[in-house]
Amino acid sequence: MTHPLIPEILDLAVPLAADLNLEVVGAVFHTHLNPPVLRVDIRNLSADTSLEDCERMSHRLETALDAADLVAGTYVLEVSSPGISRLLSSDREFVSFRGFSVIVRTREPIAGQREWVGNLVQRDEEFVYLNQKGRAISIPRHLVTQVQLNEKRS
């Protein structure tokens, strides 16, 4: 069932996307998560959708949503595209996708597991930090083989 705010959110998002030569292809509000996550999927009308497209749309939509005061309380805004590579590698991607659900794979087991799922907190020189349902997880960066956006929410 579609969240009741989605039509109003789309009314704001569609013209903003059009101004950026983008199209809104979907929106969903995951209110069962803490904090709730508003995900808006976009695509570029004239080229492959880039991380920069998502960032530009995210900034514009965040400003519009704040001004309209549609969503009460704290929430996370995710702007994404099915065409974006789901692997994170650059520092910029780790900053842009903070708060997103990720899967971290390691070359050696840590506490008996080689795959960790949680919300990305940050990456520094030594660790990748996740929030796993309120629990802080620090994974040594030298053991990390892959960090991938998670299509399924944790």
UniProtKB/Swiss-Prot annotation:
Q: Does the keyword Cytoplasm apply?
A: yes
Q: Which CDD domains match?
A: YlxS_C
Pfam families according to UniProt: DUF150_C, RimP_N
Q: Which SUPFAM superfamilies match?
A: YhbC-like, C-terminal domain, YhbC-like, N-terminal domain
Output the Gene3D superfamilies linked to this UniProt entry.
RimP-like superfamily, N-terminal (3.30.300.70)
Q: Name one GO biological process term.
A: ribosomal small subunit assembly
The entry's localization annotation reads: Cytoplasm
Q: Does the keyword Kinase apply?
A: no
**Record keywords, A-Z:** Cytoplasm, Ribosome biogenesis
Annotated Gene Ontology cellular component terms = cytosol
Quick one: where is this thing mainly located?
Answer: cytoplasm
Q: Which family does it belong to?
A: Belongs to the RimP family.
Q: Which HAMAP family match?
A: RimP
Q: Which PANTHER family match?
A: RIBOSOME MATURATION FACTOR RIMP (PTHR33867:SF1)
What this chain does, per the entry, is described as: Required for maturation of 30S ribosomal subunits.
NCBIfam families noted in UniProt: PRK00092.3-3
List the protein's name. Ribosome maturation factor RimP
* Species name: Cyanothece sp. (strain PCC 7425 / ATCC 29141)
The gene designation is: rimP
